[in-house]
Amino acid sequence: MPWIQLRINTNSDDAETISDLLMEEGSVSITFEDGKDTPIFEPKLGETPLWRDTVVVALFDAETDLTPTIAMLKTLPFLGENFSHKVEQIEDKDWVREWMDNFHPIQFGTRLWICPSWREIPDPTAVNVILDPGLAFGTGTHPTTALCLEWLDSLDLSNKEVIDFGCGSGILAVAALKLGAKNVTGIDIDYQAIDASRANAERNDVADKLALYLPEDQPADLKADVLVANILAGPLRELAPLIAERVKTGGKLALSGLLKEQAQEISDFYSQWFDMDVAAHKEDWSRLTGKRK
């Protein structure tokens, strides 16, 4: 069914108040957008930062009369009689179906394919990971995930123990197992990620080789031959001593979730534990690799 969309130009100080008022007026969905294309790359844990110029976007049922709502908004001192807004009708879409229609099998490196569960496998003789991302991040389409998958494909993982730090959908963990890893430990702060990783491991018949933990539950003596962490620069720096402790001497490391301009600083920081290689790049993103000293 169609929807009525109300867009209000405001600022970060007032956006939350407007959002609360619109929910009271019957809005079924509220989102915030950047009013002036100003990026926020990496909020601190627990923060939900907003842009200085923020657009509040509210959806209402198509039958909703917004006249009283707009009249109420005009009485707010921080908006005023002539506040900037736009009302339009938008058609509903089956967004899940649209996304599924555009997610096709993708090859990474020479052996590895990531195949959506609803698509036919292009090469049955290849190493195929059958993926249903569900609620967690990680389909292989993002440059950071692609960089990590290409790196895993380049390794000989036979009889290797692997850690996937920030496992998300489990795509890297499952790929490592399908590429021959002895076992993989996946760690994530999100229960949904743990569930999605488990489901994708079961779909690929490798669940018996995958152990999944929240950070506080991971074994204290956990060690691996290979560790991959596709998270963000801030957590990578904060977790560096723990990540280094988890990699065996001579073991291999891959870090991603980094913007190009962040890569050198993180590489320099990790060099106290690892012999770091030259960074690899894809679009605006980077991957760092190294060997444990």
Swiss-Prot record:
Domain of life per record: Bacteria
Reaction(s) this enzyme catalyzes, per UniProt: L-lysyl-[protein] + 3 S-adenosyl-L-methionine = N(6),N(6),N(6)-trimethyl-L-lysyl-[protein] + 3 S-adenosyl-L-homocysteine + 3 H(+)
GO process terms (BP): methylation
SUPFAM superfamilies reported in the protein's UniProt record: S-adenosyl-L-methionine-dependent methyltransferases (SSF53335)
Enzyme class, UniProt record, top EC level: transferase
InterPro entries per record: Ribosomal_L11_MeTrfase_PrmA, Ribosomal_PrmA_MeTrfase, SAM-dependent_MTases_sf
Pfam family, one: PrmA
Main location: cytoplasm
Enzyme Commission no: 2.1.1.-
GO cellular component, one term: cytosol
Protein location: Cytoplasm
Keyword field: Cytoplasm, Methyltransferase, S-adenosyl-L-methionine, Transferase
Recorded GO MF terms: protein-lysine N-methyltransferase activity
Heme listed as a keyword: no
Record-annotated membrane-spanning stretches: none
Keyword S-adenosyl-L-methionine: yes
Positions bound to S-adenosyl-L-methionine: T145, G166, D188, N230
Protein role: Methylates ribosomal protein L11.
NCBIfam families assigned to the protein according to its UniProt record, in alphabetical order: prmA
Family of this protein: Belongs to the methyltransferase superfamily. PrmA family.
HAMAP family linked to this entry: Methyltr_PrmA
PANTHER family listed in its UniProt record: ELECTRON TRANSFER FLAVOPROTEIN BETA SUBUNIT LYSINE METHYLTRANSFERASE
Protein name: Ribosomal protein L11 methyltransferase
UniProt source species: Shewanella baltica (strain OS185)
